[in-house]
UniProtKB/Swiss-Prot annotation:
It holds the Pfam family H2O2_YaaD. One of its GO terms (biological process) is response to hydroperoxide. InterPro entries: YaaA (IPR005583). This is UPF0246 protein VS_0505. Belongs to the UPF0246 family. GO terms for cellular component: cytosol. NCBIfam families: PRK02101.1-1, PRK02101.1-3. The lineage of its organism: Bacteria, Pseudomonadati, Pseudomonadota, Gammaproteobacteria, Vibrionales. It comes from the Bacteria.
Length: 258
């Protein structure tokens, strides 16, 4: 079972590291190509392109300038520990064990606009470049065209290496659009998390993002290797709803939160 999640805009390069182990990202040459494009952008360009404040634009122009093709523990940290935000609050990687990190390294992948696809312990320098950014480059007008089949091919490698063909999609639509389902050597299953609000069950973004992280952790901690086992996910009050689920979607619901 392979799990994919989105990255996060919020980053943490200050907190103590939960593990000293690390690996190197695989697509540095591709990332360097994007960095060269980004280095031609002014702060005003970045602000308009990414729809961010002048302050955040300035920060990211500086990040593009400082980015290096050499990744060390001085200029980078493990992706699973660098990303913060709702998904990663649910995942809570800081409290994973060494065995958990081993399992995650083989079974979890993070999609990324700049890095393409990251293993949890891959070193990552700070950046902001969302997959939906319409950044013109030599391969096309956006990052989906830039990455093409590269991400899907690497996911196929990971699926084949672990011996089954199930991919659990815990990523957002923006990021999963970088995967080409027709070229994927596996069955895609997308968990859907619905929370009760005013008597109605619906996807509430904040809760759904956190739930994706909690499910990723559940898979890692329990070494989940079947869809049937995944339906027993019950973290934070979620429960599986078989009658609303199908071969492509697993629906989980939760009662209203006070």
């Amino acid at each position: 079972m392979l799990v994919v999640v989105s990255p996060a805009k919020t980053l943490d390069y200050e907190s103590p590291l939960a593990t000293e182990r690390f690996s190197q990202p695989e697509f540095v040459e591709h990332s360097a190509e994007l960095i060269e494009v980004c280095r031609k952008l002014t702060p005003a360009d970045v602000s308009a392109l990414m729809k961010v404040s002048d302050k955040i634009a300035g920060l990211n122009v500086a990040r593009f300038e400082q980015w290096s093709e050499t990744f060390t523990q001085e200029n980078a940290r493990q992706a699973i520990l660098a990303f913060k935000g709702d998904v990663y609050t649910g995942l809570d990687a800081e409290t994973l064990s060494d065995d958990d990190f081993d399992y995650a390294q083989n079974h979890l992948r993070m999609l990324s606009g700049l890095y393409g696809l990251l293993k949890p312990l891959d070193l990552m320098q700070p950046y902001r470049l969302e997959m939906g950014t319409r950044l013109a480059n030599e391969r096309g007008t956006n990052l989906y065209q830039f990455w093409g089949n590269i991400i899907t091919d690497k996911l196929n490698e990971a699926l084949n290496a672990q011996g089954d063909n199930v991919l659990i999609n815990l990523a957002s639509n923006e990021y999963f659009k970088a995967v080409k389902p027709k070229s994927l050597d596996g069955q895609i299953i997308t968990p859907v998390f619905k929370d009760c609000k005013n008597g109605q069950y619906k996807v509430i973004s904040f809760y759904a993002k956190k739930a994706r992280g909690m499910m990723a952790r559940y898979i890692i901690e329990n070494k989940i290797d079947s869809v049937e086992a995944l339906t027993r996910f019950d973290t934070a009050g979620y429960y599986f709803v078989e009658e609303e689920s199908n071969a492509k979607e697993l629906v989980f619901k939760r009662e209203e939160q006070n």
